[in-house]
Amino acid sequence: MKKQILMAGAAMLALSAGAQTAIPNSGGDNDEQGLIQTVFGIKEKTDKFHLYLNTQTNFNLNWSGEGGTDFDGGRFAFKQLRIEFKGQVNDWISYRYRQRLNKGQSELGYFDNILKSIDIAEVGFRYKKVNFVVGKQCAAYGGIEFDLNPIEVYQYCDMIDYMDNFMTGVRAAWDITPSQQLQFQILDGIALNPGEMYGENITKAKLPFLYTVNWNGNFNNIYSTRWSASFMNEVKNKHMWYFAFGNQFNFTPRCGAWLDVMYSREGIDRKGMITNVVGEQDGHNALNTEYFTLLLHMNYFVHPKWNLFGKVAWERNGVYKSTPDVVKGTYGIDWLYVGGVEYYPLKDRGLHFFLTYVGQRQGHTAKAQAYGLPSHSYTNLLTAGFIWQIPLF
């Protein structure tokens, strides 16, 4: 009994600690011994239960304004803090649960009756080459950066930052070969109350589902793909199409890159970025909006423990068809710049420390300026801290 109390106490203490990197496929399945195992000398670890604390802890200095030179201040923060446990019950049943500990809740409730702070609450069933997953899960969207553990990303591009990623439904994954996989997924497209997402003056869709087909490919560990096409019934008679093409390149064991191409065409503005410019139309979000993103990330390990990385994203947002209130055309051209250095003190490259610069330029065309926005604005961020997916057990 005393040992059980001590183990529970150690887990709670670990939850108050703080941290992993912008390198794909570091999902936590490593051989590092868990904190509870180390403290209590547990010799064997079972695949039926793995417990992690995903954290990104940092100190930030912020500048903003039209020139990006107005100092806004500094602060310490947990940018990401998630508890996660998962396991393999037997050869054909698995489970996974992950919840964000530093995310607020909606007072209006949730369409799928599950807290938005819960990323994943799923059960998987495998039969030969096919795996079926039921519950709240990550959308099977393409893109390399989208597939990363959120703690590994210093700043998302707007396309992903304004996207709903975790929804309830079913997914089937077919391993055609060990290096080629197809996924088919149906999710509740509405996570929050529909009125909160799109405005009150809408007619809800009777089947507001998100349908996605996804291809994950690997070619000799040199070139990998994560491509997808999605269709969603947003509200009655308004639909969304989303395409994402992720391409990862491993040039050498030390040098790699990925290129993500993303396009979203929304009958009613799901992301809300255009609505933030032009305002609501007849009590609902703007209509006929579109978003396009190109993202390039590169990294180079100058030493087994030292990594240099850089990322640039170019994004365009606009309206593809005029309405009586809003004219067709481009409203914004945005740039994102991220670069820095990481230090990995451990061989498994789980824990790492970082010093990172994040710069964002928001450009507004004449169409957006007609709504009172400046031609452009900048934000600059200098951040230092550490990232770690702490293996508690």
Regions found by a protein language model. Give the residues of each.
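N-terminal periplasmic/intermembrane-space "pro-region" immediately following the signal or transit peptide
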Residues: K2-A11, S16-Q56
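Outer-membrane beta-barrel pore domains
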Residues: A22-D29, Q56-N58, N62-F71, Y110-F111, ...
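Short loop/turn motifs that connect adjacent beta-strands in outer-membrane beta-barrel proteins
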Residues: I23-G27, I36-L51, W92-Y95, R126-K129, ...
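Hydrophobic, lipid-facing positions within transmembrane beta-strands of outer-membrane proteins
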Residues: Q33, Q37, K79-I83, K116-V123, ...
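Outer membrane beta-barrel
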Residues: F40-L61, F71-L192, G217-F219
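Short aromatic-enriched loop/helix-cap "lid" or pocket-rim segments at secondary-structure transitions
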Residues: E145-D147, E196, K271
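Glycine- and other small-residue-rich loops at beta-strand/loop junctions that grip anionic moieties
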Residues: D161, K204, L287
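Loop-centered beta-sheet repeat module
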Residues: Q185, G189-Y242
